[in-house]
Design a protein with these regions (language model features):
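Bacterial N-terminal signal peptides that target proteins for export
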Residues: 1-9
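Class I SAM-dependent transferase core
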Residues: 17-51
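Conserved class I S-adenosyl-L-methionine
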Residues: 53-62
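Glycine-rich SAM-binding Motif I of class I
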Residues: 64-68
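Conserved SAM-binding motif I beta-strand of class I
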Residues: 77-82
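S-adenosyl-L-methionine
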Residues: 85-118
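A short SAM/SAH-binding and catalytic strip from SAM-dependent methyltransferases
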Residues: 117-133
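C-terminal substrate-binding/active-site "lid" region of AdoMet-derived donor-dependent transferases
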Residues: 129-184
Length: 184
């Protein structure tokens, strides 16, 4: 199933079955596992203006594609935060196979409980309700000028410094770029 089909099924499930929508964005599970296509990963990191040596956190890192790309193509250090042990294992194996263990690590746990204060950039592909739940943590712990990049789902109440439209195959994406200290 391609990305467009995954998102269509997710949208249908959320609209038809409110209980499905409540399953994510509650407790610790912030989103279903829908990998971001590689061209969108790269566009997100470009939109964040990631620089060599900066620290990128990816919330809900899945198979590790964002943190791996941040290290390989942008020269950044990166931390992926993923709640599912199976995805942490897959990501860790990929990182080791690519020899990136000195610049990339995966933390198994909740994005709601991780210390984000060292981050220069935070990326995420979570639901709007999950973004709302994370917003107080982002506001409290991220230092001014930290960039927050959300794929597809805006952070309600924040004004993006940039909204990037991108395509991967037939699917269109909205990439919301925020900067702490300039979200109003």
């Amino acid at each position: 199933m391609n990305m467009q089909a995954h998102l269509a099924v997710l949208a249908a499930a959320v609209s038809i079955y409110p209980a499905f929508a409540q399953q994510f964005g509650t407790a610790e599970n912030l989103a279903p596992d829908i990998p971001t296509p590689q061209p969108i990963v790269e566009r997100m990191l470009e939109a964040a203006h990631v620089k060599p040596g900066e620290l990128v956190y990816d919330l809900g890192s899945g198979d590790g594609r964002v943190v791996i790309t941040a290290a390989q193509k942008f020269g950044a250090r990166a931390v992926g935060v993923e709640i599912r042990p199976d995805l942490c294992r897959i990501a860790s194996e990929r990182i080791k196979a690519m020899g990136l263990e000195d610049r990339v690590k995966i933390v198994q746990g909740s994005a709601l409980r991780v210390d984000l204060s060292p981050a220069d950039v935070v990326t995420m592909f979570l639901l709007t309700t999950s973004n709302e739940r994370l917003k107080p943590t982002l506001e409290k712990y991220l230092k001014p000028r930290t960039r927050v990049v959300s794929n597809q789902f805006p952070i309600k109440g924040w004004k993006p410094v940039e909204t990037v439209r991108a395509r991967a195959g037939a699917m269109g994406y909205s990439i919301y770029v925020y900067e702490i200290g300039h979200t109003e």
